[in-house]
Amino acid sequence: MRDLPLTSLALVLSALGALLGTEALRAEEPAVGTSGLIFREDLDWPPGSPQEPLCLVALGGDSNGSSSPLRVVGALSAYEQAFLGAVQRARWGPRDLATFGVCNTGDRQAALPSLRRLGAWLRDPGGQRLVVLHLEEVTWEPTPSLRFQEPPPGGAGPPELALLVLYPGPGPEVTVTRAGLPGAQSLCPSRDTRYLVLAVDRPAGAWRGSGLALTLQPRGEDSRLSTARLQALLFGDDHRCFTRMTPALLLLPRSEPAPLPAHGQLDTVPFPPPRPSAELEESPPSADPFLETLTRLVRALRVPPARASAPRLALDPDALAGFPQGLVNLSDPAALERLLDGEEPLLLLLRPTAATTGDPAPLHDPTSAPWATALARRVAAELQAAAAELRSLPGLPPATAPLLARLLALCPGGPGGLGDPLRALLLLKALQGLRVEWRGRDPRGPGRAQRSAGATAADGPCALRELSVDLRAERSVLIPETYQANNCQGVCGWPQSDRNPRYGNHVVLLLKMQVRGAALARPPCCVPTAYAGKLLISLSEERISAHHVPNMVATECGCR
C-alpha cells in the first residue's frame, strides 16, 4: 500500500472511512475529542454578525470559554488540529525542530520564522480567522503539482501568512524550489519528524491552473526523486485508516479592524458627516445649449432606481490622458463607420479654451470634412431609431421626452441640416448607452437572450465567470461537495464578441443587425462553447464508485 499512487482507490478508501465514521489519526498523535469544539451559543456574539461557515476550536484549556478559541474557516481534520497544537506547544528546541523537519538553524529557513509567527498567533488569536484548504487534485508528471480548494469569498486576498503542511513518510533531505515559494527551502525529515512545512508567498497559484508545482532535489545527490519516493515522502501513511495523509494549505488573512463585542452589546460610533467637496458641486451651465441639454438628459436617466440623486463624477483630463487611447480621425468617414458599428462608450473632450470661454467653438465644422451622403443618412436613421426605442422603454422620468425632443431639434443630423454632424454622432452614442442600461431595468423580467443583450451591461463583454455549484443536494455524490463549474455572463455586442476564436459568421451578422436597430426575436446570448470533465465519487447500489463525468465545467464562452 506504501508504493501505490494517489488514485481513485485511495480516494474511495478515504470516502469510505468518512462514511463509516472512522477517525483519521496517526498512531503517535494524541486523540482529539469533542472537548476541543466550541459552539456558537457558548460565546457572546455581536448582534447582526454574519452567519459564516466558522468552526471554533480550543487547542488548550477547557471548552467553557475561558481560553481564546480559534476561528477556523474550512474543514479542520484531526491532522490539522494536531499540527496546530504542536506549533502552539513548541519552544523551538532541538526536539521541536526535529518534529517539524527543520534543518540546522544556521541554514536559511523560510518556514521557521513563519512557524514562530503562527505559534504566537495561536497563543493570542485576537479574533483573526484561519483558513484551511484541503488538497483537491495532484499530478506527478513532469513535476509534482498540488491543487487545493479555492478559498471562500473574501479569503482569496494576499494573506499575512501561508503555510503548506505535509504529513511525511520516510525520505531523504531535500531542497524544494518553484514559483510561489520565497526562494529555496530545505526539508530534513528524520525518525522524529511528524510534519514538514513550506512557506508560500504567492498562495493564489495553489488553487488556480494546475496548482502549486514543486521541484524536490535530494541534498547531496544529482538525480531526482522517483514518483514512488515522492509519494512516500509527501503523502505519509496513516496505518489506522489504511490510507495516505494529504497536505493542507493554511492561510492567515490580514487582520482587519472590527468592533469588539462586550457581553452581547456592540459600541458603535456614527460616521462623521461628509465634508463639502468642490468636485461634487453643480457645474455652471454650459453656454452651448446642445451640451447643456444632453448633460441634463444623461443625468436624468443615469440616476439609479433606488436613490433620488447621485453624486456627479468629475473627469480629470490629465488622468484620462494616462489611459490607453486610440487615435480616430473624425474627418474620415471610414473611422466614423467603425464607431457606428459598435456600442462602446465614446468620450469627447473639448479644448480647455472652448470649455472656459463664453462662446465655445463648435465640435466640428461640417464643411471641413468629406461627409458622404450615405453616412449622414445612416447617422440620422440610427439616431431616430435609438430615440424611438428609448421613448418606448417603461419607467422613464417625465423629463425624458421634452429633453430628447429638444436635442433632436438642435441636432438634425441630415447632410443638409444646420446641425453639426459630430453632434449627431455624440447624441447617438449617448442614446445607445442609455438604451442598453434601461433595457436591463425592464421590470417584465427579460429572458436569457435579453439579459445577455442588455441587462448584464455592467458586467462587461461576454466572458467566463466563476460559479461554485453545491453538490450536497445530490445525495448520491460523495466527493466533491462543491466544485467550480463556472458560467458565461456578459454583453453580446459588436465588436467585443468576436474576441472568442470560436465565433461564427451567423452571430456576427446578428450582432450587426442588432446594432443597426433591427428587432430580433432572440438576440445573441452569452453561452458556454467548451467544457471539461470532472471526477465524481458517488454511492450507487451500496457501492462506492469513481467515474469521470464529461461536460461538468465551462471553460470557454461565446455568443450564439
From Swiss-Prot:
Keyword match Secreted: yes
The pro-peptide lies at 25-451
Tell me, which GO biological process terms does this entry list? anti-Mullerian hormone receptor signaling pathway; cell-cell signaling; gonadal mesoderm development; Leydig cell differentiation; Mullerian duct regression; negative regulation of ovarian follicle development; ovarian follicle development; positive regulation of gene expression
Extract the GO molecular function terms from the UniProt entry: growth factor activity; hormone activity; signaling receptor binding; type II transforming growth factor beta receptor binding
GO annotations of cellular component type: extracellular region; extracellular space
Q: According to its UniProt entry, what is the function of this protein? A: Plays an important role in several reproductive functions. Induces Muellerian duct regression during male fetal sexual differentiation. Also plays a role in Leydig cell differentiation and function. In female acts as a negative regulator of the primordial to primary follicle transition and decreases FSH sensitivity of growing follicles. AMH signals by binding to a specific type-II receptor, AMHR2, that heterodimerizes with type-I receptors (ACVR1 and BMPR1A), and recruiting SMAD proteins that are translocated to the nucleus to regulate target gene expression.
> What is the name of this protein?
Muellerian-inhibiting factor
